[in-house]
């Protein structure tokens, strides 16, 4: 029989590679590991890669297995979901994987300048009603700049046409370098082992016949960032709390 939420929370609290710092816990108290992830936790100088909004954490675990020469930190606020990947990585004895339970809105409180090399955004909520909540908005790009190396890599993998289109316009508006972009990942020439890792939710999107979009771009440290001023057609489907809850057809 599977564990209930309380049992999973108890497990998470005991795991040595899990850090739980929701907004209230770090509101006025500095995070001890900030600037010390390499030295005190991973005990190496390998690049640190974040997965923001990791859900169950399968992508982070998959990347950690593929790249033992990189360090991976999965971030989400839902502890019961993260338990899956946290448990799997612990049982596998993976030393290059950690989990951080916190609100992504305060992600810059956990990492020092230049401490992170890459960010993965895997199937993030497109937040169609409010741009500042989108993980590819300039609001979040400015936060990422506080800890990402200059020209650090950002990967967006999404089922949402709205999120893909918005991100594409944001990149164009700010002249950010794009290394690869496709509207249909699994019918492109970039299907490799990394992008072939499929999470629980991704498989459900594929089973419904939705194409998976992917953008890999760089975020320079310099330059003022501007939001794109354009109307984008909203996603029409409903699933996993991603719904078009108003009569609007487009949004900025």
From Swiss-Prot:
It is an enzyme of class 2 (transferase). It catalyses: guanosine(46) in tRNA + S-adenosyl-L-methionine = N(7)-methylguanosine(46) in tRNA + S-adenosyl-L-homocysteine. The keyword Ubl conjugation does not apply. Pathway: tRNA modification; N(7)-methylguanine-tRNA biosynthesis. S-adenosyl-L-methionine binds at residues 51, 76, 103, 125. Substrate binds at residues 129, 159, 199-202. Signal peptide: none annotated. GO terms for molecular function: tRNA (guanine(46)-N7)-methyltransferase activity. Pfam families: Methyltransf_4. Belongs to the class I-like SAM-binding methyltransferase superfamily. TrmB family. Catalyzes the formation of N(7)-methylguanine at position 46 (m7G46) in tRNA. This is tRNA (guanine-N(7)-)-methyltransferase. It comes from Bacteroides fragilis (strain YCH46).
């Amino acid at each position: 029989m599977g564990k209930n939420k309380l049992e999973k929370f108890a497990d998470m609290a005991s795991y040595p590679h899990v850090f739980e710092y929701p907004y209230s816990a770090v509101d006025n108290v500095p995070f001890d590991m900030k600037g010390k992830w390499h030295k005190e936790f991973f005990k190496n100088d390998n690049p640190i890669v974040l997965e923001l909004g990791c859900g169950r954490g399968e992508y982070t675990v998959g990347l950690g297995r593929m790249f033992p020469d990189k360090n991976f930190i999965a971030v989400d606020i839902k502890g019961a979901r993260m338990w899956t990947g946290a448990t799997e990585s612990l049982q596998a004895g993976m030393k290059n994987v950690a989990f951080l339970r916190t609100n992504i809105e305060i992600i810059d409180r956990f990492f020092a300048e230049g401490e992170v090399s890459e960010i993965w955004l895997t199937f993030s909520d497109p937040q169609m009603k409010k741009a500042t909540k989108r993980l590819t908005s300039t609001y979040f790009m400015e936060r990422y700049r506080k800890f990402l190396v200059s020209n650090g890599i950002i990967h967006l993998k999404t089922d949402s046409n709205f999120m893909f289109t918005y991100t594409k316009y944001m990149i164009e508006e700010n002249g950010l370098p794009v290394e690869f972009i496709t509207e249909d990942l699994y019918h492109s020439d970039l299907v490799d082992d990394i992008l072939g890792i499929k999470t629980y939710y991704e498989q459900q999107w594929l089973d419904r016949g939705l194409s998976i979009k992917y953008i890999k771009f760089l975020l320079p440290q310099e330059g003022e960032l501007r939001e794109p001023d354009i109307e984008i057609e909203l996603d029409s489907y409903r699933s996993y709390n991603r719904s078009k809850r108003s009569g609007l057809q487009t949004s900025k």
